[in-house]
A protein has these predicted regions:
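Glycine-rich FAD pyrophosphate-binding loop
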Residues: 5-24
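Short beta-strand to alpha-helix junction loop
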Residues: 37-47, 102-118, 215-220, 273-279
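Flavin (FAD/FMN) cofactor-binding and adjacent substrate-gating region
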Residues: 47-126, 251
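C-terminal catalytic lobe of FAD-dependent flavoproteins
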Residues: 118, 238-279
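A conserved short coil-to-beta-strand element within the FAD-binding core of flavoproteins
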Residues: 128-143
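Glycine-/small-residue-rich beta->alpha transition segments that form the dinucleotide
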Residues: 145-147, 151-157
Length: 279
Protein backbone atom coordinates (compact mmCIF):
# COMPACT_ATOMS: atom_id res chain seq x y z
CA UNK A 1 0.00 0.00 0.00
CA UNK A 2 2.84 2.41 0.82
CA UNK A 3 4.41 1.63 -2.57
CA UNK A 4 1.11 2.31 -4.35
CA UNK A 5 0.70 5.57 -2.44
CA UNK A 6 4.13 6.60 -3.72
CA UNK A 7 3.37 5.91 -7.36
CA UNK A 8 4.61 2.35 -7.85
CA UNK A 9 2.63 -0.32 -9.69
CA UNK A 10 2.27 -3.32 -7.39
CA UNK A 11 1.28 -6.96 -7.88
CA UNK A 12 1.03 -9.35 -4.92
CA UNK A 13 1.71 -13.04 -5.56
CA UNK A 14 0.53 -15.37 -2.79
CA UNK A 15 -0.49 -18.99 -2.42
CA UNK A 16 -3.32 -17.98 -0.05
CA UNK A 17 -5.28 -14.84 0.70
CA UNK A 18 -7.54 -13.88 3.61
CA UNK A 19 -9.34 -15.64 5.27
CA UNK A 20 -6.90 -18.54 4.76
CA UNK A 21 -3.71 -17.07 6.21
CA UNK A 22 -1.82 -17.25 9.49
CA UNK A 23 -2.57 -13.54 9.96
CA UNK A 24 -6.31 -14.28 10.05
CA UNK A 25 -5.76 -16.44 13.14
CA UNK A 26 -3.41 -14.10 15.03
CA UNK A 27 -4.59 -12.45 18.24
CA UNK A 28 -2.69 -9.41 16.94
CA UNK A 29 -1.70 -6.73 19.41
CA UNK A 30 1.06 -4.15 19.44
CA UNK A 31 3.74 -5.69 21.64
CA UNK A 32 7.36 -6.54 20.76
CA UNK A 33 7.48 -10.34 21.13
CA UNK A 34 10.00 -12.90 19.85
CA UNK A 35 11.75 -10.42 17.58
CA UNK A 36 15.29 -9.12 17.20
CA UNK A 37 17.52 -7.11 16.96
CA UNK A 38 15.99 -4.92 19.66
CA UNK A 39 17.79 -1.75 18.56
CA UNK A 40 15.98 -1.99 15.22
CA UNK A 41 12.66 -3.52 16.27
CA UNK A 42 12.14 -0.80 18.89
CA UNK A 43 12.42 1.88 16.19
CA UNK A 44 10.15 0.01 13.77
CA UNK A 45 7.68 -0.71 16.55
CA UNK A 46 7.53 2.94 17.61
CA UNK A 47 6.65 3.99 14.07
CA UNK A 48 4.01 1.26 13.81
CA UNK A 49 2.39 2.30 17.09
CA UNK A 50 1.79 5.80 15.71
CA UNK A 51 0.28 4.42 12.50
CA UNK A 52 -2.04 2.05 14.36
CA UNK A 53 -3.05 4.79 16.79
CA UNK A 54 -4.14 6.90 13.82
CA UNK A 55 -5.98 3.97 12.23
CA UNK A 56 -7.93 3.39 15.45
CA UNK A 57 -9.78 6.63 14.73
CA UNK A 58 -10.99 5.42 11.33
CA UNK A 59 -14.07 3.24 10.71
CA UNK A 60 -13.79 -0.44 9.73
CA UNK A 61 -10.04 -0.81 10.38
CA UNK A 62 -10.48 -3.25 13.26
CA UNK A 63 -7.89 -1.33 15.32
CA UNK A 64 -8.80 -0.46 18.92
CA UNK A 65 -6.66 1.28 21.54
CA UNK A 66 -6.98 -1.05 24.53
CA UNK A 67 -6.13 -0.77 28.22
CA UNK A 68 -3.64 -3.55 28.90
CA UNK A 69 -2.21 -5.21 32.01
CA UNK A 70 0.99 -7.22 31.76
CA UNK A 71 1.79 -9.34 34.83
CA UNK A 72 5.13 -10.55 36.18
CA UNK A 73 6.16 -13.09 38.82
CA UNK A 74 9.40 -11.18 39.51
CA UNK A 75 10.25 -7.47 39.68
CA UNK A 76 11.11 -6.02 36.26
CA UNK A 77 13.03 -3.12 34.80
CA UNK A 78 10.99 -0.74 32.67
CA UNK A 79 10.65 -1.99 29.07
CA UNK A 80 12.56 -0.32 26.24
CA UNK A 81 9.23 0.69 24.69
CA UNK A 82 7.89 2.45 27.81
CA UNK A 83 7.92 5.89 26.17
CA UNK A 84 6.14 4.61 23.05
CA UNK A 85 2.85 3.49 24.59
CA UNK A 86 0.14 5.64 26.20
CA UNK A 87 -0.40 5.91 29.96
CA UNK A 88 2.36 3.56 31.12
CA UNK A 89 2.58 2.86 34.83
CA UNK A 90 3.92 0.12 37.10
CA UNK A 91 1.68 -1.45 39.77
CA UNK A 92 2.44 -3.77 42.68
CA UNK A 93 -0.99 -4.09 44.35
CA UNK A 94 -4.31 -5.79 43.48
CA UNK A 95 -2.67 -8.39 41.26
CA UNK A 96 -3.67 -11.97 40.42
CA UNK A 97 -2.22 -14.68 42.65
CA UNK A 98 1.51 -15.43 42.19
CA UNK A 99 2.19 -12.12 40.43
CA UNK A 100 4.20 -9.34 42.10
CA UNK A 101 4.23 -6.59 39.47
CA UNK A 102 2.13 -5.27 36.61
CA UNK A 103 2.73 -2.89 33.72
CA UNK A 104 -0.43 -0.98 32.78
CA UNK A 105 -0.57 0.79 29.41
CA UNK A 106 -2.71 1.43 26.34
CA UNK A 107 -1.82 -0.39 23.14
CA UNK A 108 -3.51 -1.25 19.82
CA UNK A 109 -5.41 -4.49 19.39
CA UNK A 110 -5.87 -5.37 15.73
CA UNK A 111 -8.85 -7.56 14.85
CA UNK A 112 -7.22 -9.23 11.89
CA UNK A 113 -10.25 -10.39 9.85
CA UNK A 114 -11.49 -6.78 9.87
CA UNK A 115 -8.07 -5.22 9.37
CA UNK A 116 -7.15 -7.50 6.48
CA UNK A 117 -10.47 -6.67 4.82
CA UNK A 118 -9.79 -2.96 5.26
CA UNK A 119 -6.27 -3.34 3.84
CA UNK A 120 -7.63 -5.25 0.84
CA UNK A 121 -10.14 -2.49 0.05
CA UNK A 122 -7.43 0.14 0.39
CA UNK A 123 -5.08 -1.85 -1.85
CA UNK A 124 -7.76 -2.38 -4.51
CA UNK A 125 -8.75 1.30 -4.46
CA UNK A 126 -5.15 2.29 -5.21
CA UNK A 127 -5.00 -0.02 -8.23
CA UNK A 128 -3.03 -2.93 -6.80
CA UNK A 129 -3.42 -6.36 -8.40
CA UNK A 130 -3.38 -9.89 -6.95
CA UNK A 131 -2.23 -13.23 -8.34
CA UNK A 132 -2.79 -16.53 -6.52
CA UNK A 133 0.27 -18.62 -7.29
CA UNK A 134 3.44 -20.10 -5.84
CA UNK A 135 7.09 -19.83 -6.89
CA UNK A 136 9.77 -22.55 -6.69
CA UNK A 137 12.60 -20.04 -6.18
CA UNK A 138 13.67 -16.45 -6.86
CA UNK A 139 15.94 -17.30 -9.78
CA UNK A 140 13.33 -17.51 -12.54
CA UNK A 141 10.95 -14.62 -11.91
CA UNK A 142 9.58 -12.65 -14.88
CA UNK A 143 11.54 -9.61 -16.02
CA UNK A 144 8.40 -7.46 -15.85
CA UNK A 145 9.15 -6.45 -12.24
CA UNK A 146 11.78 -3.87 -11.29
CA UNK A 147 11.84 -4.86 -7.61
CA UNK A 148 10.71 -7.99 -5.75
CA UNK A 149 9.76 -7.64 -2.07
CA UNK A 150 10.08 -11.01 -0.36
CA UNK A 151 7.45 -11.39 2.37
CA UNK A 152 7.25 -15.20 2.23
CA UNK A 153 7.68 -15.60 5.99
CA UNK A 154 8.28 -19.18 7.07
CA UNK A 155 8.63 -20.33 3.45
CA UNK A 156 11.78 -18.21 3.12
CA UNK A 157 13.58 -21.00 4.92
CA UNK A 158 12.96 -23.27 1.94
CA UNK A 159 13.04 -20.73 -0.89
CA UNK A 160 16.35 -19.24 0.24
CA UNK A 161 17.82 -22.20 2.12
CA UNK A 162 17.87 -19.96 5.20
CA UNK A 163 18.76 -22.08 8.21
CA UNK A 164 17.95 -19.24 10.61
CA UNK A 165 14.21 -19.56 9.91
CA UNK A 166 12.09 -21.73 12.21
CA UNK A 167 8.41 -22.15 13.14
CA UNK A 168 6.96 -20.96 16.45
CA UNK A 169 3.75 -22.90 16.94
CA UNK A 170 0.79 -21.05 18.42
CA UNK A 171 -2.63 -22.24 19.55
CA UNK A 172 -5.56 -20.07 20.66
CA UNK A 173 -9.14 -20.40 21.89
CA UNK A 174 -11.91 -18.03 20.84
CA UNK A 175 -14.57 -17.52 23.54
CA UNK A 176 -17.63 -15.35 24.00
CA UNK A 177 -17.12 -12.55 26.52
CA UNK A 178 -17.84 -8.84 26.90
CA UNK A 179 -14.40 -7.99 28.27
CA UNK A 180 -12.83 -4.73 27.13
CA UNK A 181 -9.37 -4.89 28.73
CA UNK A 182 -6.38 -7.00 27.73
CA UNK A 183 -4.37 -9.14 30.14
CA UNK A 184 -0.91 -10.56 29.39
CA UNK A 185 1.87 -12.70 30.78
CA UNK A 186 4.46 -12.59 28.00
CA UNK A 187 7.11 -14.78 29.61
CA UNK A 188 7.68 -17.80 27.36
CA UNK A 189 7.38 -20.39 30.14
CA UNK A 190 4.04 -18.97 31.38
CA UNK A 191 2.78 -17.32 28.18
CA UNK A 192 -0.80 -16.12 28.65
CA UNK A 193 -2.87 -13.58 26.75
CA UNK A 194 -6.49 -12.51 26.96
CA UNK A 195 -7.30 -10.28 24.00
CA UNK A 196 -10.75 -8.63 23.68
CA UNK A 197 -12.25 -8.05 20.25
CA UNK A 198 -15.61 -6.84 18.93
CA UNK A 199 -17.41 -10.21 19.02
CA UNK A 200 -15.10 -12.53 20.95
CA UNK A 201 -12.07 -12.78 23.22
CA UNK A 202 -8.91 -14.60 22.13
CA UNK A 203 -7.22 -16.76 24.77
CA UNK A 204 -3.65 -17.97 24.42
CA UNK A 205 -1.20 -19.24 24.24
CA UNK A 206 1.83 -21.22 23.38
CA UNK A 207 5.08 -20.34 21.59
CA UNK A 208 6.70 -23.65 20.70
CA UNK A 209 9.89 -23.01 18.74
CA UNK A 210 10.73 -25.63 16.12
CA UNK A 211 7.30 -27.30 16.31
CA UNK A 212 5.71 -27.78 12.85
CA UNK A 213 2.60 -29.60 14.15
CA UNK A 214 -0.65 -28.01 12.92
CA UNK A 215 -2.90 -30.45 14.80
CA UNK A 216 -4.87 -29.05 17.74
CA UNK A 217 -3.56 -30.18 21.11
CA UNK A 218 -5.93 -31.03 23.97
CA UNK A 219 -3.07 -30.49 26.41
CA UNK A 220 -2.46 -26.98 25.05
CA UNK A 221 -6.20 -26.24 25.16
CA UNK A 222 -6.40 -27.23 28.84
CA UNK A 223 -3.23 -25.31 29.69
CA UNK A 224 -4.49 -22.14 27.99
CA UNK A 225 -7.81 -22.24 29.85
CA UNK A 226 -6.04 -22.88 33.16
CA UNK A 227 -3.59 -20.00 32.70
CA UNK A 228 -6.21 -17.51 31.51
CA UNK A 229 -8.73 -18.37 34.24
CA UNK A 230 -6.02 -17.97 36.88
CA UNK A 231 -5.91 -14.30 35.86
CA UNK A 232 -9.63 -13.81 35.06
CA UNK A 233 -11.57 -16.54 36.94
CA UNK A 234 -14.87 -15.99 35.07
CA UNK A 235 -13.22 -17.23 31.87
CA UNK A 236 -13.40 -20.72 33.36
CA UNK A 237 -17.06 -20.87 32.30
CA UNK A 238 -16.87 -18.87 29.07
CA UNK A 239 -18.58 -20.30 25.99
CA UNK A 240 -15.95 -21.70 23.62
CA UNK A 241 -16.35 -20.84 19.94
CA UNK A 242 -13.36 -22.67 18.47
CA UNK A 243 -9.70 -23.59 18.80
CA UNK A 244 -7.18 -22.54 16.14
CA UNK A 245 -3.52 -23.31 15.46
CA UNK A 246 -0.88 -21.71 13.24
CA UNK A 247 2.88 -21.23 12.89
CA UNK A 248 4.62 -17.91 13.53
CA UNK A 249 7.52 -17.18 11.12
CA UNK A 250 10.47 -17.16 13.51
CA UNK A 251 14.08 -16.23 12.75
CA UNK A 252 17.15 -15.43 14.84
CA UNK A 253 16.78 -11.80 13.66
CA UNK A 254 14.38 -10.06 11.30
CA UNK A 255 15.83 -9.99 7.80
CA UNK A 256 15.30 -6.63 6.11
CA UNK A 257 17.90 -6.11 3.41
CA UNK A 258 18.45 -5.89 -0.33
CA UNK A 259 20.00 -8.66 -2.41
CA UNK A 260 20.48 -9.21 -6.14
CA UNK A 261 19.28 -12.65 -7.24
CA UNK A 262 19.93 -13.18 -10.92
CA UNK A 263 18.72 -10.04 -12.66
CA UNK A 264 16.32 -9.08 -9.89
CA UNK A 265 16.64 -6.64 -7.03
CA UNK A 266 15.07 -8.48 -4.08
CA UNK A 267 14.20 -6.76 -0.80
CA UNK A 268 13.91 -9.39 1.93
CA UNK A 269 11.33 -8.69 4.63
CA UNK A 270 10.73 -11.73 6.84
CA UNK A 271 11.44 -13.32 10.21
CA UNK A 272 9.06 -11.18 12.27
CA UNK A 273 8.31 -13.94 14.79
CA UNK A 274 5.46 -12.97 17.10
CA UNK A 275 5.67 -9.27 16.24
CA UNK A 276 4.08 -9.13 12.79
CA UNK A 277 1.71 -6.21 13.34
CA UNK A 278 4.11 -4.58 15.80
CA UNK A 279 6.84 -4.15 13.22
Amino acid sequence: IRLLENGWKVTIWASEFSPNTTSDIAAALWYPFLSAPVEKTDVWGSNTYKVLENLSGLPDTGVTMTRTYEYFRDAQSDPSWKAVVQDFECRTVDLPEDYVECFSFVTPVIEMPLYLGWLRKRYDSLGGSLRQRTIPDFDNLPDTFDVVVNCTGLESGVLLDDGEVYPVRGQIIRVRSSMSEMHLDQQIETLTYIVPRSEDVVLGGVAQQGNWNLDLSDADHDSILKKCSSIIPELRNAEIIEDLVALRPGRTVVRLEKEFIGDHSVVHNYGHGGSGVTL
